[in-house]
Design a protein with these regions (language model features):
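Mature catalytic domains of secreted/periplasmic carbohydrate-active enzymes
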Residues: 1-323
Length: 323
């Protein structure tokens, strides 16, 4: 899964409707397209995350200024204009299209903002045909814009797959009545029991963006989650009918550090032995399955291939539950 844009409003593909994009600036490459090609070369499904909607609210502070100190009253970047870019690396671009125009704090997104969101997200779908589209929002974002892009995404999937739905739409805070329409996402969240419909959980081995101080902390895995913690989260996801996304933040050049790699190596070592307990498996029928087996010594497990939590020699062992 690749980040298509974040709250900063910068598109990581060759966007036709937004000049602030990675093909025109920075790495001068279609980053989303690069990830899509790499994933599909390995036979993997590919997803994108879209976070643009919150730019309307979250970047309004860019139009302010310090209230005290030596730079009191000096406007932040949100006040920059296209004319001020002459001779700069961003010459010809309007910063107002990146940070967003200044507006009252309680103002709702206007028609032009919503249409721009729709046009850009539709372009993303058209160019890269993601199997999964993730919105960092409660339900579909920006009213009619989100509803229409959701419909377009689903209809595009039907068209590409001979009338079969083969795509997933992820959003947050989904009420029960809509769980058949979209897959609920829980950011760094868990549920107490098994969900009726498939859902998604996500976490990060550190912060959502790269923080060097996590890398520099002492210990085998620095300030990152260790493989054991990640694997426990993964097991909990599978047993409760959910998928699991693990974010590994990259440095500015796109690489990951050796400590992050060590975390992934630890997960890989466990998966090489126990992957059959994760892939193509069914959710449990009892959420506290381990406790049930311990308490019911005369009972018979639903399946004879379950995951038990036992740590040994730095690898979480998978053992068949046989009676």
């Amino acid at each position: 899964m690749a980040l298509a844009n974040h709250h900063c409003n910068f598109d990581a593909w060759d966007s036709k409707h937004h000049p602030w994009n990675s093909a025109a600036l920075g790495p001068h490459r279609d980053v989303v397209g690069t990830w899509a090609a790499a994933a599909r070369k390995q036979g993997l499904r590919f997803g994108v995350t879209v976070h643009q909607a919150r730019n309307w609210w979250w970047f309004q502070p860019s139009h302010g200024a310090d209230k005290s100190g030596p730079l009191a009253g000096v406007p932040y970047d949100g006040a920059l204009t296209e004319a001020q870019g002459k001779g700069q690396w961003w010459q010809g671009l309007d910063p107002q299209r990146l940070d967003g125009a200044k507006h009252p704090g309680d103002a709702l997104p206007d028609v032009s903002y919503v249409k721009n969101f729709y046009d850009r997200t539709r372009d993303l779908i058209d160019q890269h045909n993601p199997d999964l589209l993730y919105f960092d929002d409660s339900l579909l974002p920006l009213g009619w814009g989100g509803m229409n892009i959701g419909a377009y995404f689903y209809n595009n999937s039907l068209k590409r797959n001979g009338g079969q739905m083969d795509s997933v739409l992820n959003v947050k805070d989904v009420p029960d009545r809509l769980l058949k329409a979209v897959a609920a996402d829980y950011e760094r969240g868990l549920t107490a029991g098994i969900m009726k419909y498939p859902w998604q959980s996500e976490t990060c081995i550190g912060a959502w963006h790269y923080l060097r101080n996590l890398y520099e902390r002492p210990g085998e895995y620095g300030g990152y989650q260790n493989p054991r913690e990640v694997i426990h989260w993964l097991i909990d996801a599978v047993r409760k009918n959910r998928t699991f996304i693990l974010n590994v933040p990259g440095r500015p050049d796109g690489t990951i550090d050796e400590t992050e790699l060590a975390v992934l190596d630890g997960i890989t070592s466990w998966m090489e032995i126990n992957g059959e307990a994760i892939y193509e498996t069914r959710p449990w029928k009892i959420s506290s399955y381990i406790e049930e087996l311990r308490d019911n010594t005369t009972g018979t497990p639903e399946a004879n291939d379950s995951v038990f939590y036992r740590w040994k020699q730095s690898i979480l062992e998978h053992r068949a539950a046989k009676r």
